[in-house]
């Protein structure tokens, strides 16, 4: 069964147009489903739809766009027609936005004949702009004066204030033919329309009195008002009777005259924008510097429109006043990742500071960025000049933001500095904000002063900051080092401390330390603070407590330093060398076969030999107390080298090693 086989009783009245919108529309408006169910019997139906009362004229008169694609989720509650009708198709979006459609099989409508006229555009301004779904009809003649548009806006507000229906508002406007409705371009006088909405109540009373005057007197008053406004056409705020808005808008600097190029500039946080407003500078990424320099050299004005990330707002615009490359102090920028990666500073002049929402710029698309909305832009994305000018004009429609107070204070400070005769270079550097380089220099100076403040700390040897000082303990025979203890590399003395630039010890276990990873460089580095308990240092007497409550005397004997074999040598102590040690001597000749055989008999391998010599140092040191000075010197030289016990045939023999093996069993 086709739709043509269906017939309803009320279809006969659809073909008959209503006479002047009289009593005919009542039964049709009471049954909204009948219009949609009638299929194509009624034709376009827009002619009779306008006469149907109380806002039901456009109900299901246009085919639903979403239903055509199978995406409408409203079902029966949808106010559009869920039926394919060629005569009731909506206007093609390409034809509406670009004026043409290149699709030959496009099923949408390509004319504005059946589209309603926009009531907001009739009053002089439509906030939807070219994206409005209603028809914008330009009326002949000059645009109406600002006062007339203001009167209409105040009248609409007064009606809404007393909860009157909006359609009554439109009907009363249609009954007053003495006011010429309509306007030229939708952006004409847009600045005045938005700023004058905050007028005082006296203006509303004046508007009501002028409606009661005859048309001739109204025309004379309009001519006088136009003559008064002619010398103030350049000033956008003179027509506003509110003094507060006049004072707030006077701070903003108008856009410069002449050719301009516009760029979107992104800021990762608000702190950088406050620094820029305070100091009049900015810094972008190094990859964008060449683009801005080329624009600065090729055109008179380079306008930067700023936007902070994740705010969905534009915060204002500024003019680029210097080329990137020269030295300009200030900055201390903060990046999103915590480390500054910006380029060099350049000076700017702030023109306007406000908060413009992205929702008010959805109709502006950038041809330089694949015709995407201006809100979708990267850092230093250039705008098409016409689009950039429109976006900058929208910034001036918004009230000044709180950053304007910072800008006023910064400008006042600059004026004071000029009056005092401060040079431009000194004025560019803000004393309240310190650069990163200055902080590093201050830290270096403080560290040098602390090192020079101690008397004997300037004496010492070695390079760098020294090394870590873990706790030392006498090693037993054949055992490995304690966790955190340092080993004995070659050419090192018995305590594992190097005479040269220091031998840094790896610390894979993260043991507790008494000092930072680098130990003291000079003997007096511990004058300002004592080490942790249990820390023992070469060349210093052990302190009781900490690791050993009774001190190291119970292990090493009274008056003896830790791990120091042999007899003490006379002479003053030297930095980084234990007290009682002999001067550094060249190593002895290579070992013989006897030492090699003994190394093979060691159960602990090479690692056990390294630490076994340490235990031998302590045992032989106690045994050598009653020997002569020559034997003590030989044992001392044997203690200073890790493998000297295996190389000296006179100091140790096989007979001496035999009892030790027996004791080991």
From Swiss-Prot:
A zinc finger (C3H1-type) spans 58-85, 86-113, 114-139. It comes from the Eukaryota. Residues 596-623 have a biased composition (Basic and acidic residues). This is Zinc finger CCCH domain-containing protein 45. Residues 33-50, 561-573 have a biased composition (Gly residues). Residues 205-238 have a biased composition (Low complexity). Residues 439-454 have a biased composition (Acidic residues). GO terms for cellular component: nucleoplasm. Keywords: Coiled coil, DNA-binding, Metal-binding, Repeat, Zinc, Zinc-finger. Residues 169-200, 239-250 have a biased composition (Polar residues). GO terms for biological process: mRNA splicing, via spliceosome; regulation of mRNA splicing, via spliceosome. The keyword Metal-binding applies. Residues 1-55, 167-256, 439-469, 561-665 are annotated as: Disordered. InterPro entries: YTH_domain, YTH_prot, Znf_CCCH, Znf_CCCH_sf. Gene3D superfamilies: ph1033 like domains, Zinc finger, CCCH-type.
